[in-house]
Amino acid sequence: MEYLGGIAGSGTLVQHGKDIARATYDFEGYETKHAGITCCGEIGSSPVVLAAVFGLTDILLRTDTGNLLEIRFSGKTLKPSQDFAHVDVRGEIPGHKREWRRRPGTILAT
């Protein structure tokens, strides 16, 4: 597994083509021989918004840069006051190493 770097920013949570709420994201990218490029990390929004969408399987994140990302909640539970959630990401993620921002000090054991 090779660490590619991270992407972060803001966007809009979308369900069935309808904008739900604004959100931030902070994702890490990895490349494996079998799965290719994978991505996971956190989205942030108000606790009320996250409670409403947590566990749903049809939520997208449209980034302010125009990418459409499919998010799947990877956590089992969400605390009522929690303003972030862990997610796995698919969709229009960067497909090349050069598109990922390297984060200093990050060490990945292989």
List each model region and its residues.
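C-terminal output/interaction extensions
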Residues: 88-110
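Short beta-strand and beta-hairpin "edge-sheet" elements
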Residues: 62-95
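Noncatalytic linker/hinge segments flanking ATPase motor cores
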Residues: 50-55, 66, 79-86, 101-106
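Solvent-exposed residues in well-ordered beta-strands and their adjoining turns
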Residues: 28, 44-46, 90-94
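Hydrophobic beta-strand residues in large extracellular and virion-surface proteins
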Residues: 11-13, 25, 41, 59-61, ...
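Acidic, aromatic-enriched beta-alpha/helix-loop junctions
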Residues: 32-72
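Solvent-exposed edge beta-strands and adjacent loop segments
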Residues: 1-35
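Short, ordered beta-strand-loop transition motifs
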Residues: 29-38, 76-83
